[in-house]
């Protein structure tokens, strides 16, 4: 029971109160402790589910499934307490070490999510052996566990427990397994939601969302952050309905504990099970209302006309009960559907009166409302009809009874009443109720369900056969079958063949035999030394290969050679088939040409022939002029040393990667078995089979994994007679990172092929019994730029690596395309052979690479996101894949959405096969390339430009050429500089290349292309395939001419670089410049170094680089390499240089840019020139910028130099941005607050706070005495003595000051920073040890370019550039200047606002040089601190407000400890500075940088506009790291000075801090620190506190501070322009957005913390609503400033 209200009752005067207190104490003593953080909704759900148990909430952990896990833990305690020493089924890996009473545990080999659970299992104790066996597939090392599952184990045990591990077993299967174990009792915890009894659909209850698709059910509870339960529907129905098992293994099933729909079942072996009826859901809060219409509006209640099942909707029971009561009691004249709908609308709104919920409400969908109205109206009509009939027939019956004589009543009284069947008030059945009759009702009430069914044991085959036949007979009649004997393979038949991709299965003809070279051969590396030298391999690899010897096992079947290479402790597999793709380390592609009849192989410049001889296998290698023969003897070689093998693999990998980075064309990627193998250097279909099942290809070249001497290679399936090549049965890595060869194409069948009555020798059951061979009839419809193709035809004609099956969610044989796959590849549906799962998709390599993809069933629900995911989940592979349109068959997904999803989620080279219907749709909606429309005006202008060009010597080739109006299709490949756009073009793809410059033309011609400049190309582009390089920089009239004349045109270029320049200044170029949209963007550059990428990231946000050069920009060094200039005049003055425009598209190793003063206008007007200049080099770029032109566009050397000087590195770290979102209007209590009067709200605020209008704007208090330092005064102290403001009200609620007054600035300088500092010389170790409670030891911190980028980004957002950052020269005053300003933002107060007598507040600003020097370090340290913060500790603003509010709401029983520092900055001294430096040293900051920081902080000069102060120590609020070090010092003081009991939450931001705890006390060492540093602490301890603009209310959350926000608006100047008024409106709108769901709660809480009336807060919210609506009223006021300062005394020191 909920008894909090009785715990604090004062005085017990009655027996009722005594009983209540005893009940409360007993409930709390036996309460369930809830440890996870929960939302309000989750707390309400748990309280309702766990009744009558008392709950105690002590949040300290975050769980993915908090509700289920709390219930699970409670039921687990119950089961373990009653089972004693027992056998456990499917134990969670984390629970193994905690339960020593378990004598044996039954597991299954982990798949899917179970693998993750085993990875997080303990690595010590009993769990270690279980973990090792499960992850490595090893047998059990002792009898305490097994991996055979409950059904496959026979360990004897009398008692067992199963915690949520029997959902995939039926009661009959469990009965047999218990008999096998000799088990008499089994405690089983199961999740049995009642919705599984309903037809497929989506059901949302107050606790969870259930998705039921007919076979599987997925349950996700409120607030879950990952996937929920996923169970088989038939098994869940069996567990709900069954109370006993009969047969040879009888059982009694009793429900001994229930929490919601979570049950503990006690299964007891009993010889004669007796009836045990039970009501499973007596406390169900939902009623399921049946819709008369099914999906899509089809009638669903009449099976003779439609087989669609009914649709049900979950409706709150109170809604249905009230609706029935209202409708059944209405007067006949008043009853109508309209009144019923009005009443339903009324009770669906939630109504709260104070804390009393008057109406719970219901948030329903349109479909649910329609179904409820229909069902309620018809049900009430039926009841009214029954009532009318009952009264009518009853009256007639009464008339007949009273008309009887005396004898008849006496006979009835004597004989009928004495019968045992007599029940007073029993009604006659007027109608026989059938479940599909409308009169049977429309709703299912789980509260009245009663079950008592028996399940026969599986061993009773006679009963099974009889039930199966009866089931089939009922299906033949067209009735629904609820039999649990559904076939495992699903429904197959003619009704499933609605996909045109389905084809028949024919028998392949026998193929001619090929000479066999199968056997085992010894391959020494010394025999291949000449070949290695011809391959130009490094001497290190040649030497290491010479010391190794491999054993190669060859298997040749059907013109295919499979090799298994044993090299030391590693095993490699390769498959040689004709057309196999060979992996390359460059852009060139290599395909293997293999002729088994001629015994030859060739690819690129390499070829070989082989033949069997008496001495073994003789191979002849031909490569790079080499003709070498080698003979390999049969046998098995001794195993090479594992260390030598690993060293060879590592060296070979480094060589491949080096060639991949630096080679322009590339070569073969050499694998170990490709060099030390029979058919070197080929290794198609390379697969490494590791001894460790979780050791992938990425670890082949490292020593990360322990090297095992004995390697057991997995069994290879025998090769049957099938058309696709066989693939090894196990994947190389868990992620399928293997390059599989494409299947060999099917040869056309001979005219008369004899049928095969049995498979060839060697075929096993694992191979398909029926194979096929079909001629190709596919038709190419479209080709995409990435090489993907769309065909009309059959999927099985594809030669892609993978075939994608349109599977169901269970991956069982079905209809349509799935049935066609089952006929061809039945072994591919074996779940045990699935090598990987990605979402719902399953990958298998048996008998060939196949992906079973799962599309959504659009008959149930349209789910575009699931459709996108179905295609996306098939892309976790290497190689190409062949698709059909997923879901367009049985699942009725429209063709258009499925095709669009494939377009967005496929990989280059994939193929899509369409049936005829989809092909006709595709041809009608064929995707087209981008088009450029040439209008008559553009054509006329272009022809004018061509005429002007043809009159020059350069343009004579264009004479007579014309551009005509029309439409031009084009392909435009855009990319970042150096992305390889030009290198992607091959000679076979193009006839003519058009380039803008001579340098580019020569470069293309050196590669063998026919390249021309834009003018001369006019003679050769007609009807040719044309590629235009650097297209944006071509003169637009020539670009249009070549695009229109070419047969096909492919544009290359970068839209961000230099466009075409109008050299003639005739205005024709900008008039006709075409707007070209790129068809593809390339973001990876192979040219630009890392620092250049960071500089140009603003123009290319997604740029990445493969360059290993980190820094390439240098200033002030001598010129190197190619010189670049901006103007022709500079080119003439620097011989050998080229302009940036001429260098566009070129690549140089080293370049030098010379910026001259005459290029200022060019650079400022065209940033593209700077981008082109920066992106021409690969190694080094020297900048000679005497005029400082590049600094003006943001290219500064000081920022980069200072960053590397401070120890920065190139790299990436976690960004500092915290993602935040706007709260959804789920409660929207703010809508209940109408706009109110601004004047009345502010007057009420003044009345409640006691503030009154004053005739002055501010008071200048007397200036304090200067206690330390030296003050420099201005000559004159005259200033304005009045203030003009546009204000919301004339009463302010802030501590007002005069920031524009010179005397006010002097008072602040002296009063804040001229006070004497109290020094404290002590060790920092004690305070650092105390601080470790919140900030543990940090360790070395890495400062990367990520922090530098964030710093520059912050500068740019403030409108700053790098010009203010100077070289680090401490002799330069501009480097170390600290500027001082007076704050114009005053502090909200409930006290005195004018005559407060306090000096103002100041803010300082360090130089941009120091900010850029220390800023990246402080950002990196802050990130490290955030990563180490304990749970429940919040720092600054680095968290989402909802997370902080949830943590506060979870700390229900806490008080709020608040501390307010007075003069926080002024009291910081040498001790606080020393603590900062100690933490910097702990983080690895360079010593010189720490000493520099200490020097700047210990002695400084604050430079005000007309004053300055030389002082010592203190803290300046505007220096870099202000928030960081203020917060750290705040944490250190609080944790060192105070001890907290029942600590829950702590938050620190600058000098503001709160701690949520039950009580606190001052620690023993606090007085020393407080007195030594002169700290001024003001501590408050109360139920509700204030922190950083929010009200902290434990148990409720962090609420916006309405009073403070409204009060701070009163001191602002909101004029004179309309911009300030708009800023006010936006600020108020943002604040109101935070009040969306908590407005009413804020009224109660904020009024309590400030001691004001709730009506004031209500009125203030209404006032803010009016301001947000743009209805703010401003008043202009002129108020004087009262000067109370005396003459300032000058003291000479």
UniProtKB/Swiss-Prot annotation:
Region Hinge, residue ranges: 712-778
Regulation: Putative protease: Inhibited by chymostatin.
InterPro entries: (+)RNA_virus_helicase_core_dom, Alphavirus-like_MT_dom, DNA/RNA_pol_sf, Hepatitis-E_Cys-pept, Hepatitis-E_hinge, Hepeviridae_RdRp, Macro_dom, Macro_dom-like
Cofactors required: Mg(2+)
Region (Disordered): 737-769
Entry EC number(s): 2.1.1.-, 2.7.7.-, 3.4.-.-, 3.6.4.-
Changes after translation: ORF1 polyprotein does not seem to be processed into distinct enzymatic domains by a viral protease belonging to ORF1, but could be processed by a host serine protease like thrombin.
Binding site for ATP: 975-982
Name of the protein in its database record: Non-structural polyprotein pORF1
Lineage per the UniProt record: Viruses, Riboviria, Orthornavirae, Kitrinoviricota, Alsuviricetes
